[in-house]
Amino acid sequence: MQHHHQGSYGGGGGGGGYPGQAYREQNPYGYGQQSPQQGYGAPQQHNGYNQPPSGYGQPQHNGGQMYGQRQQGMWLRVRIASRDRKFLTFALGQYQNHYSHPHQGGPPPPPSEPVAFGHGAPQGYNFQYSRCTGKRKALMIGINYFGQKGQLRGCINDVKNMSTYLNQNFGYAREDMVLLTDDQQNPMSQPTKANILRAMHWLVKDAQPNDSLFFHYSGHGGQTPDLDGDEEDGYDEVIYPVDFRQAGHIVDDEMHRIMVQPLRPGVRLTAIFDSCHSGSALDLPYIYSTQGILKEPNLAKEAGQGLLGVVSAYARGDMGSMVSTAVGFLKRAAKGDEAYERTKQTKTSPADVIMWSGSKDSQTSQDAQIAGQATGAMSWAFISALRKNPQQSYVQLLNSIRDELATKYTQKPQLSCSHPLDTNLLYVM
């Protein structure tokens, strides 16, 4: 197991003022019960499933401007200033997804219409960006492992800093945040495996298009041999609850099953992992560099019967069947190249899932001693970059985060997504 925080803990804290009670009131499963491990389906709200959310208007810009829009592989969308504001789309032989200022107002907002996955995906398999104008919920986990071998110093600070930032700058209400840290007296607020899994279910329950969900983990991360054959490096990424010695770790496949697969189109889940081996902690298949260059699955090559079953369930609006089909398909997969090539397709999502991770899978996360507090380097850099400029595109923000880290660290955070991402769009949350 890797360690990623050193230094002195500069915050103390007894969890005062954090919404343990609000969480229990909203918890659909009831604290103290076993978290539901079987038959976890998606919200049963299918009306208008394939329709864009109401009030989801066109981007309101003035003047002519161009911005990159990935659609069906290599395309560029050109905004034409005209009375009826039509869009014209031109095919290009090659599209370089580097940022150029589209207009004086900054990067354009996400599009309102569903977007095709492209790259060989079956027809009708679309995803939907979220405009993050709906309900906000956040789950934040910080574990210092007090009294254990490998005790950390900064993880609770990470959670307190992030929760304050989200509350003051992004409209996340305290009563809609759940903080699990191992300095709290309430046993339901301890970051045990059972509490973490239960809180993950709470986070995504009843999420609607344009809602904005936020997940933050700061603690030990590691790798374990991959039993499904779906990881390129042969290892699953894991996180370690405070009681991992008794209850065990939580594998990336399980986090993906709980927090990504049930989400409807247009729901945003933003995840930040400040831990070792967190580069693919949510098993998201699309990965971006600072130039916006994309690592993506070839859906044409990999669209086997398993994916088609998932897509047909998706087209019917049958999210429960989609989840069970995907999980069953993963369990049936054989080890080796075939398993990896086939299963990463089921890790796509019609929702809008974005992950900022503090290290690539092959790296070990670093720590920082910032303003007298031991703090996770990724958490600190994310907040610092957005404070300096809240109006950035995805690729600008990724570069800004790396610039923040470059003064002290060799760590290179990465941006992962559940769908093809136009990294020139405005980052919203």
UniProtKB/Swiss-Prot annotation:
Composition bias, Low complexity:
20-45
Highest taxon above the source species: Eukaryota
The record's EC number reads 3.4.22.-
Listed GO MF terms? cysteine-type endopeptidase activity
Q: Is Hydrolase found in the keyword set?
A: yes
Region spans: Disordered: 1-68
A biological process from GO: apoptotic process
Biased composition, class Gly residues, residue ranges = 8-19
Write out the catalytic residues in the record.
220, 276
Keywords on this record?
Answer: Apoptosis, Hydrolase, Protease, Thiol protease, Zymogen
Kindly state one GO CC term assigned in the UniProt record: cytoplasm
Top EC class, one word: hydrolase
Composition-biased stretches, type Polar residues, lie in 46-62
- Please describe what this protein does: Involved in cell death (apoptosis).
Family to which the UniProt record says this protein belongs: Belongs to the peptidase C14B family.
Spell out the protein name for this chain.
Answer: Metacaspase-1A
Species assigned in the record: Aspergillus clavatus (strain ATCC 1007 / CBS 513.65 / DSM 816 / NCTC 3887 / NRRL 1 / QM 1276 / 107)
